[in-house]
Amino acid sequence: MKSTSQIILITGATHTGKTALAQKLLEKYKFPYLSIDHLKMGLIRSSNTTLTPTSADEALTEYLWPIVREMIKTAIENNQNLIVEGCNIPFDWQKDFEQDYLANIKYYCLVMSKKYIQTHFDDIKKYANVIENRLDDSGCTIDIIIEENKQMQESAIKHRVNYVLIDDEYKIQIERKENKCLQ
């Protein structure tokens, strides 16, 4: 299978800017994006699952990932570009794709450093609703954000996957297949 499509997977802890980055790439490059949260809520609200928005992340990933991965394969087979963003992308995602598919997929895990979070926590809270309305953000504390990002970075290192460390400033560059910069 020869495909020129590009699939961009964006994951990371809560409040790292996954949806905002996907929206920015959509606007600049006209790549459509799939929010895994939207898929999750559609399946929950239509009663196609017994899971709830507060179900454990592991259970949600186990349920959602097989659907998302097959959507990715379909996009590649149809030579279409797609951005997929959400926290329900497993760290071992590569095992689900043959090499022909992997050649079309770029994976980015967004991680904020402890220093960045401590220095910019007010900004993190301020931009929390820049793309999606969070109904209840009271659980977003500096300690939780630090811990989730620490766990995300440790898991990325353990599984040897690409991660983008947001340390001094929030600036993320993503390369296109043609070596042009997506920003």
Language-model segments: what does each one mean?
Residues M1-S5:
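Phosphate-binding P-loop
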Residues I10:
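Hydrophobic anchor at the beta1->P-loop junction of P-loop NTPases
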Residues T14:
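The conserved Walker
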Residues G17:
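Conserved glycine(s) of the Walker
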Residues Q23-I67:
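Conserved substrate/cofactor phosphate-moiety recognition/catalytic segment
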Residues A59-N104, Y108-M112:
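Glycine-rich phosphate-binding loop used to anchor ATP phosphates in small-molecule kinases
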Residues I105-N149:
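A glycine- and Lys/Arg-enriched "phosphate-lid" helix/loop adjacent to the NTP-binding pocket
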Residues V130-E175:
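Small-molecule kinase domains that catalyze NTP-dependent phosphoryl transfer to phosphate-bearing small molecules
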